């Protein structure tokens, strides 16, 4: 059914420009999706260039397999394991750029059968790879109320997390929920105050999705791995869509741009300081979509692109 869903790639040119493509370079698109970024990268590569794409969504893999290009290869798996994929190809330390477009994609949101949307009724799944791990329904049916409340508060930043968790557990005791519409209705009924600008299920659906897919852990691991796989001068170009994602990316780039921090008052020789190493990255700034892009694609409104460059440290 995926062919019915139109996907507009957010910050397409800006993210690829951020990679500073060399015609003979080796690049990674860690979130292939429907291939918008990958196709643009390929258009800028010469005959000797290479692109390794990664995605854990089987539908994205099916799209990627339609690209008949000897410079292109696709891996079915999470981008957190990019260091393994690179090592298997003997490319560690040779990657010239990594692009990550974080979060859920429009085709995933718009396909009711994937279970990501509270606006369309479908199976309560939410897995980016439906062949692995627990579905949202399975987790909500087996998790403790306190754990559900913590997830909703932590990953959804929802102040009524405890109320919602209690309502979910009580409903599942009566009859286990298996549909997105059922969960959305339970959440709405549990909310004592409604936000007129936001659907009551927005934050909880985000939280459950992040938890089911281990999204924030995936980002943290991929960022750590990037330091070992990037060549000196290699670029990181990362698009995030909500504050939890962007906070992780921003903190990582800031910390790696500062280098090791020595507490004040601790004497160290120049030789000792050198052993600590220098800055791993040079932060090159951030970009946000313009008014025209947001008008054409409202989902771009919250996106932030951050770019950094690997140093010689």
Swiss-Prot record:
Binding site for S-adenosyl-L-methionine: 35-37, 55, 79, 101, 108
Protein source organism: Klebsiella pneumoniae (strain 342)
Function: Specifically methylates the N4 position of cytidine in position 1402 (C1402) of 16S rRNA.
InterPro entries according to UniProt: RsmH (IPR002903), SAM-dep_MeTrfase_MraW_recog (IPR023397), SAM-dependent_MTases_sf (IPR029063)
Domain of life where this protein originates: Bacteria
Disulfide bonds: none
Cellular component aspect of the GO annotation: cytoplasm
Listed GO biological process terms: rRNA base methylation
Catalytic activity: cytidine(1402) in 16S rRNA + S-adenosyl-L-methionine = N(4)-methylcytidine(1402) in 16S rRNA + S-adenosyl-L-homocysteine + H(+)
Compartment list: Cytoplasm
Similarity field: Belongs to the methyltransferase superfamily. RsmH family.
EC number: 2.1.1.199
An MF annotation (GO) of this entry: rRNA (cytosine-N4-)-methyltransferase activity
Gene3D superfamilies recorded: Putative methyltransferase TM0872, insert domain, Vaccinia Virus protein VP39
EC category name: transferase
Alphabetical list of PANTHER family matching this protein: 12S RRNA N4-METHYLCYTIDINE METHYLTRANSFERASE, S-ADENOSYL-METHYLTRANSFERASE MRAW
NCBIfam families referenced in this protein's UniProt entry, alphabetically: 16S rRNA (cytosine(1402)-N(4))-methyltransferase RsmH
Record has Methyltransferase as a keyword: yes
Entry protein name: Ribosomal RNA small subunit methyltransferase H
UniProt keywords, alphabetically: Cytoplasm, Methyltransferase, rRNA processing, S-adenosyl-L-methionine, Transferase
């Amino acid at each position: 059914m995926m062919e019915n869903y139109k996907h507009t790639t957010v910050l397409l040119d800006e993210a690829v420009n951020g990679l500073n493509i060399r015609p003979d370079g080796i690049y990674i698109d860690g979130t292939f999706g429907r291939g918008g970024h990958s196709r643009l990268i390929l258009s800028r590569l010469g005959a000797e260039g290479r692109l390794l794409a990664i995605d854990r969504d089987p539908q994205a893999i099916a799209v990627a397999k339609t690209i008949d290009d000897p410079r292109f290869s696709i891996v079915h798996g999470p981008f957190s394991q990019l260091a393994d994929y690179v090592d298997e190809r003997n490319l560690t330390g040779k990657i010239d750029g990594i692009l990550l477009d974080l979060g859920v994609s429009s085709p995933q949101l718009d396909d009711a059968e994937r279970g990501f949307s509270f606006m369309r009724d479908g199976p309560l799944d939410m897995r980016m790879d439906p062949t692995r791990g627990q579905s949202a329904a399975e987790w909500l049916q087996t998790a403790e109320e306190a754990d559900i409340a913590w997830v909703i508060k932590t990953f959804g930043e929802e102040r009524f997390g405890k109320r919602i968790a209690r309502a979910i557990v009580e409903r599942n005791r009566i009859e286990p929920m298996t549909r997105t519409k059922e969960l959305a209705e339970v959440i709405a009924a549990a909310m004592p105050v409604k936000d007129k600008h936001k659907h009551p299920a927005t934050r909880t659906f985000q939280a459950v999705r992040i938890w089911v897919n281990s999204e924030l852990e995936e980002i943290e691991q991929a960022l750590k791995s990037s330091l070992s796989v990037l060549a000196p001068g290699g670029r990181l170009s990362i698009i995030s869509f909500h504050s939890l994602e962007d906070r992780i990316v921003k903190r990582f780039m800031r910390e790696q741009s500062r280098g090791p921090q020595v507490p004040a008052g601790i004497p160290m020789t120049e030789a000792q300081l050198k052993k600590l190493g220098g800055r791993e990255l040079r932060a090159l700034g951030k970009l946000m979509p313009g008014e025209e892009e947001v008008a054409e694609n409202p989902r771009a409104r919250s996106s932030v692109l951050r770019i950094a460059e690997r140093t010689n440290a």
